[in-house]
Amino acid sequence: MIIAALARRELKEGDLSELSRLGMAAAEGPSLFALPGYEREKAWARLVANDVALWRQDKLEWSEVGSGALVYGPPGTGKTQFGQAFANALGLKFVSTTVGKWQKAGHPDDTLRAMHQSFAEAAAADGAVLFIDEFDSLGHRGMLHGERYQLYWQIVINEFLSLMTNLPDGVIVIGATNFRELIDPAVLRSGRIEEHFELSLPDDRTRFSATT
């Protein structure tokens, strides 16, 4: 079944349960495909699942797999839930961090070291979703004021861009934010965090589906 799905480059939800046979990690919690809502996001996830499966079969270069996405919206819209469920749907490890954790030590070298550690942890998993919350805290170079502050965040943003340009095979980055407009446009360009999904608060029907 899974070989036929790979040949047609189209995995159905029933096929996704077979991905573990390809060496993909099992993850706890529901799959994205089992959750109510997220219809646009599910369509993208199916495309990525196709490509990840082909990559694991050495039939597709990782550079041809979507490298990242942004989920944004007000608090309570399920951004973290989406990231975990997306990883589950693809059988990938879920590695979660925040820009705030990277910044905790305050010194640029410590921030960069923490950033590299997150990417290294994801790279070591042989297939992982690196979920980065507080994504807007990376900064926007057009909004920086003060020479010292500007230099600090230019270093941080430039290093993040370098990591995205040289993203390890098997790593998909999901950024999450309440404030998309505060993110540097270079971070969101094609080939980096190129898919953008706005999440809204669930309506009554979706809430009902989630509890039944």
Describe the residue ranges of each PLM region.
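Interdomain "pre-motor" coupling segment immediately N-terminal to P-loop NTPase/helicase cores
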Residues: M1-E28
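Short hinge/gating elements
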Residues: A26-A34, H196
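Walker A/P-loop NTP-binding motif of AAA+ ATPase domains
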Residues: P36-T212
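Intrinsically disordered, low-complexity regions
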Residues: L16-L19, G29-L32, Q57, M164
